[in-house]
Amino acid sequence: MKRAVVVFSGGQDSTTCLVQALQQYDEVHCVTFDYGQRHRAEIDVARELALKLGARAHKVLDVTLLNELAVSSLTRDSIPVPDYEPEADGIPNTFVPGRNILFLTLAAIYAYQVKAEAVITGVCETDFSGYPDCRDEFVKVLNHAVSLGMAKDIRFETPLMWIDKAETWALADYYGKLDLVRNETLTCYNGIKGDGCGHCAACNLRANGLNHYLADKPTVMAAMKQKTGLK
């Protein structure tokens, strides 16, 4: 039996990963992390979606220690979430240092326990917010270290790594879940479900990608299929 664990926030990217994983694996588990995030409404959304989509199990892990250690606008109410700035340089204040290191490591431990062969994460280097822990190089290096440390080959899969946001919408549509992803996920840094606040970087990337996809579905769908190998 093929098993996988999806790092699941209830947002656009991880929900699309879950939808695909359910088609590719016999048994899919979800793991969601409570780190005291500003947008922690995503945890309830993740619970609802994991149940609705048919995950075998859904674990919510308490990692609120991360909130104490990592200073970010997502972990401190005193630091405002910035509006999207298209020309902004450097790492944005929404970056939570160490978050994906911790999440992927804990997800791998869970995968070890449930005998899953893969941990799936929705990180993306093509169309992202400048986070260093979303890079392909980082994921591969951590995957190697975790596999060595566990003496077990648990594969980190990144199905969205080389597709952009428009193509991510196309992927959701390919599996017949475009409306679900649009209306029932929570991507917004300010914790607003669906189309979100419309001002933060997460909402901007999501909206621009959706508009691009809806404006030229055949071209974007073809590009997504070419990059992912889907027929």
Curated annotation (Swiss-Prot):
Source organism per UniProt: Escherichia coli O157:H7
Cofactor binding note: Binds 1 zinc ion per subunit.
Annotated pathway: Purine metabolism; 7-cyano-7-deazaguanine biosynthesis
Gene: queC
The reaction(s) this protein catalyses: 7-carboxy-7-deazaguanine + NH4(+) + ATP = 7-cyano-7-deazaguanine + ADP + phosphate + H2O + H(+)
Function: Catalyzes the ATP-dependent conversion of 7-carboxy-7-deazaguanine (CDG) to 7-cyano-7-deazaguanine (preQ(0)).
UniProt name for this protein: 7-cyano-7-deazaguanine synthase
Keyword Zinc set for record: yes
Alphabetized UniProt keyword annotations: ATP-binding, Ligase, Metal-binding, Nucleotide-binding, Queuosine biosynthesis, Zinc
